[in-house]
């Protein structure tokens, strides 16, 4: 035999090393296949290699038992068992009911139903829940006495695999969502044409006046960007000649727009940053219109002087119970209109109330100077413009409450979960299904509130439409009657009218808040609120809609934060992109 070359030796070593490795892995059969595919040199010379059979022994597979067996395969007979008789009776009963249902198809329906109960199959035309719907009156009366069985029957229908209601449910959910998104302002044209019996002679002329309002034409709304981020607060300055609009956003920017400035081709807008967090409220004192006050979640209230062009801090609230500098986020501010116009009221996200005289320097607050009005966030509050000691608050706890600041004590806070709190006397409250977003008070003692229950509620405390005495005559211990004596805060305030309005703003749109016009020059009390269909709705204090302001071509977003000029019937709304829509 000729000696092997170096290359052949290396090749044989590689083959042997691979065989050893495969043998360790218990893959000898794979080694044989490799050997057959790559014959060695001796095979090329005609010498045959002894065939080895080291293949692993096959594992005997046991037949897999079925997880379920029928009674027939198991050899079980059912004819004489109680279970078989029960099944047979059920089948006979089902056949009988089927014949009755065929007969009932030609009769009218009895009782009330959900829409899903009346859905029919698109191919056959039969009701998908005909067994539930097609019943005689005596059967309905019988089932009314056993609501539990009815509920179980409904669940059985909804869980029936033979009934496909997925597509129908989607359609009905769409209809439901559309119903939730409807607002009365969406049907302004229809409501206007159907309200000819309204006894107010000025209603039609007032609607005509608002119908003539158009978007500010000098600039494209896309160019009127007053803040960098989503607008959270807006204020229409009372000036009628040189109009000024201010707006704040969620990061503390404050934009000022000189509406009637003609010096530049672009809108005369200046954006400041007086706050570190979201601006909650902007207001202009009636007694000093050259100043603008703003509050924010950073705990500060600042004064902007238009004459001096200065911004100064008026109040900084920090938690008196904390050793470190922990700010109390200010959620709303208002100035007294009756009595002393220099007193500023404010509320916090923690449910507190605080008041400060602007003529005196601010000092660090003490624990007993904070009043407890709610245990949760106060999103909005208002002052009775006729009596400054009466305020109303709207809270995340699903209520709005009316308070008397003349009667303050610890005993008034027994309702609170917090200890050693001080509260004013509460006249009563209104309870909502969901959070109450805002409340506002006008000169004729009407209050308007709205919240996430998709309603606008108007309350009459002037005694014109209720048996209660006028709110201005309530004593500091007055409380309307309540049926439940265990209620620490009675739910005794009822609205005299309720308006359907979509308030589901979601995450990216600011909360909708209804606001009265402060001093209407035409003498008609009215409030404005944004409409989720990219518009502004205006109502009078009777709940009659006066206008639905929009422009389908130019209004590109929801003007969620809305305000009216204090005197003139001009409206402005701010969007999530920091843009303004002015109707004049």
Curated annotation (Swiss-Prot):
GO terms for biological process: DNA damage response; regulation of DNA damage checkpoint. The keyword Coiled coil applies. Residues 59-68 have a biased composition (Basic and acidic residues). WD repeats lie at residues 226-267, 274-314, 373-413, 431-469, 506-549, 553-584. One of its GO terms (cellular component) is nuclear periphery. SMART domains: WD40. Residues 29-90 are annotated as: Disordered. Residues 76-110 form a coiled coil. Gene3D superfamilies: YVTN repeat-like/Quinoprotein amine dehydrogenase. Residues 29-44 have a biased composition (Polar residues). Keywords: Coiled coil, DNA damage, DNA-binding, Repeat, WD repeat. GO terms for molecular function: DNA binding. It holds the Pfam family WD40. It comes from the Eukaryota. Belongs to the WD repeat DDB2/WDR76 family. This is DNA damage-binding protein CMR1.
């Amino acid at each position: 035999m000729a000696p092997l070359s170096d290359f052949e030796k290396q090749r044989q070593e590689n083959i042997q090393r691979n065989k050893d490795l495969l043998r360790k892995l218990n893959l000898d059969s794979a080694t044989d296949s490799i050997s057959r595919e790559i014959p060695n040199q001796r095979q090329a010379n005609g010498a045959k290699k002894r065939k080895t059979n080291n293949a692993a022994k096959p594992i005997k597979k046991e037949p897999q038992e079925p997880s379920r067996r029928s009674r027939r395969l198991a050899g079980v007979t059912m004819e004489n068992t109680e279970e078989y008789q029960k099944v047979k009776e059920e089948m006979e009963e089902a056949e009988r009911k089927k014949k009755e249902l065929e007969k009932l198809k030609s009769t009218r329906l009895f009782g009330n139903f959900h829409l899903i109960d009346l859905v029919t199959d698109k191919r056959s035309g039969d009701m998908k829940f005909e067994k539930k719907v097609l019943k005689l009156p005596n059967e309905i009366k019988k089932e009314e006495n056993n609501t539990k069985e009815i509920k179980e029957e409904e669940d059985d229908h909804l869980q029936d695999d033979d009934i496909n209601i997925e597509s129908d449910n989607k359609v009905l959910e769409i209809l439901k969502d559309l119903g939730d998104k409807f607002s009365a302002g969406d049907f302004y044209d229809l409501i206007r044409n159907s309200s000819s019996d309204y006894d107010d002679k000025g209603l039609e002329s007032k609607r005509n006046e608002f119908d003539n309002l158009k978007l500010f034409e000098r600039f494209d709304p896309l160019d009127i960007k007053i803040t960098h981020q989503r607008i959270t607060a807006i204020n229409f300055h009372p000036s009628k000649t040189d109009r000024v609009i201010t707006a704040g956003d969620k990061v503390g920017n404050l934009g000022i727009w000189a509406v009637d400035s003609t010096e530049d081709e672009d809108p005369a807008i200046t954006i400041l940053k007086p706050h570190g967090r979201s601006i909650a409220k902007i207001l202009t004192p009636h007694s000093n219109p050259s100043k603008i006050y703003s509050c924010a979640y950073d705990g500060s209230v600042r004064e902007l002087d238009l004459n001096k062009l200065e911004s100064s801090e008026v109040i900084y609230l920090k938690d008196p119970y904390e050793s470190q500098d922990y700010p109390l986020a200010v959620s709303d501010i208002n100035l007294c209109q009756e009595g002393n116009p220099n007193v500023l009221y404010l509320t916090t996200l923690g449910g507190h109330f605080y008041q400060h005289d602007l003529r005196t320097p601010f000092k660090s607050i003490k624990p007993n100077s904070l009043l407890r009005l709610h245990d949760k966030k106060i999103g909005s509050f208002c002052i009775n413009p006729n009596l400054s000691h009466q305020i109303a608050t709207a809270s995340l706890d699903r209520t709005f409450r009316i308070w008397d600041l003349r009667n303050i004590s610890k005993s008034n806070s027994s309702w609170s979960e917090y200890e050693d709190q001080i509260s004013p006397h509460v006249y009563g409250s209104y309870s909502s299904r969901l959070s109450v977003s805002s409340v506002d008070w006008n000169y004729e003692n009407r209050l308007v509130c709205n919240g996430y229950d998709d309603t606008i509620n108007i309350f009459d405390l002037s005694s014109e439409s209720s048996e209660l005495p006028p709110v201005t005559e309530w004593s500091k211990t007055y409380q309307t009657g309540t049926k439940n004596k265990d209620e620490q805060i009675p739910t005794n305030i009822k609205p005299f009218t309720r308006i359907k309005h979509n308030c589901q703003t979601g995450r990216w749109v600011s909360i909708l808040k209804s606001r009265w016009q402060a001093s209407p020059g035409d003498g008609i009390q009215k409030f404005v609120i944004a409409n989720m269909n990219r518009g502004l709705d205006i109502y009078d204090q009777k709940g009659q809609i006066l206008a639905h302001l929009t422009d389908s071509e130019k209004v590109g977003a929801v003007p969620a934060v809305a305000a009216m000029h204090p005197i003139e019937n001009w409206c402005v709304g701010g969007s999530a992109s920091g843009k303004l829509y002015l109707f004049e």
